[in-house]
């Protein structure tokens, strides 16, 4: 399958909120990246609303041109919002209030009960669910057990090692191994966090060599 690009516009909203005005507008920027060929748009509604807000989710939910991927924590408040606006995808992510951005994958074992509940509710409304996980085999199997339709593999360590010209092959092999397993188990595979032109081009060049 051909690779697809999803673009996260959260930090356009961060700039807007810092200015205290209506611009820059994440909706306008989303339209621009769609014009340039993006295959989907990602927004993260955090519990503290530090960038994307509820009203943004309402507007993005009306976009039909490309799929909308809503990132959110696994809790009842966010579940209610997702069921109201029905995005194409929901990616369940961990959240810490003191983090600048999402720092790692879900602790599925610790949060299994609430994650299972959220996935079940979303699946019943035909909203495709994804779990944001670290690239390890255990979490791929756990995601399948919870009936997630997709996994998003955390690429942060890989991207950082590429940026610093360190030994990134080990991290790449972890991601590839998990991606192949998830696909074999019937799940769609997404990958994200910290990727840029250099790290993405590396994955393309090395995909058939390792």
Give a label for each model feature.
Residues 47-60, 76-78, 99-117, 138-139, ...:
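Active-site-adjacent beta->alpha loops and helix N-cap segments on the catalytic face
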Residues 1-68, 75, 83-86:
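Conserved N-terminal beta1-alpha1 strand-loop-helix module at the mouth
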Residues 5-9, 41-43, 68-70, 90-92, ...:
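Hydrophobic faces of well-ordered beta-strands that scaffold small-molecule active sites
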Residues 25-40, 83-95, 137-157:
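Alpha/beta enzyme core
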Residues 68-108:
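Glycine/small-residue-rich loop that forms an oxyanion/phosphate-binding "nest" at active or ligand-binding sites
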Residues 10-12, 46-48, 71-75, 95-97, ...:
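Active-site beta-loop-alpha junctions enriched in small/polar residues
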Residues 92-146:
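Hydrophobic, well-structured mid-protein blocks that either form specific transmembrane helices
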Residues 203-210:
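Conserved small/polar residues in nucleotide/adenosyl-binding loops
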